[in-house]
A protein has these predicted regions:
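C-terminal and inter-domain tail/linker signature
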Residues: 1-153
Length: 153
């Protein structure tokens, strides 16, 4: 990849977070290849009849998770604090995601609490300029603590 390709990869990922900040899930998905992989490694939400895990495809699992997060945290936002890329289309991003809970989210009841949580996102952008893979990591225990969900086994 050329310097132009590296710049394009960063631009695509920056546009993704801009769309996320604007709650434009359709735009987030448009920036991804049709078969883009999706991995929210620590993600697991227990529902009444099923468990949603954070692995699959952007257009199925990713889209559902983003819409549900935005619905539960209507002021959800993000701040990109660091971004870097290489000539293979790999982009690493440190981003702080924050929001105030307005509805229950999975097993996390709504206490109206606010969270600020650092995340690491790893993207792979293909030669066509579309995101082919998204992987993200964060501290779920800290997220749940900030939202008042304390569990003792």
């Amino acid at each position: 990849m050329s310097v132009t390709s590296i710049t394009r990869s960063v631009e695509v990922v920056t546009a993704f977070f801009d769309a996320y900040r604007a709650h434009d899930v359709e735009r987030m998905v448009e920036l991804c290849a049709d078969n883009a992989d999706f991995h929210y490694v620590p993600f697991e939400v227990w529902g009444k009849q099923r468990v949603i895990r954070g692995g699959g495809k952007v257009r199925t699992i990713g889209k559902v998770i983003w819409r549900t997060l935005i619905d539960s945290f209507p002021d959800l936002t993000n701040e990109v604090t660091y971004i870097t890329s290489d000539d293979e289309g790999n982009v690493a991003v440190e981003v702080v995601i924050s929001g105030t809970q307005a509805k229950p989210f999975g097993s996390i009841g709504n206490q109206g609490l606010h969270y600020d949580l650092p995340h690491v996102f790893l993207f792979r952008v293909g030669k066509e300029g579309l995101i082919e893979e998204i992987t993200a990591y964060w501290d779920t225990a800290d997220w749940q603590r900030q939202l008042g969900r304390l569990e003792v086994d």
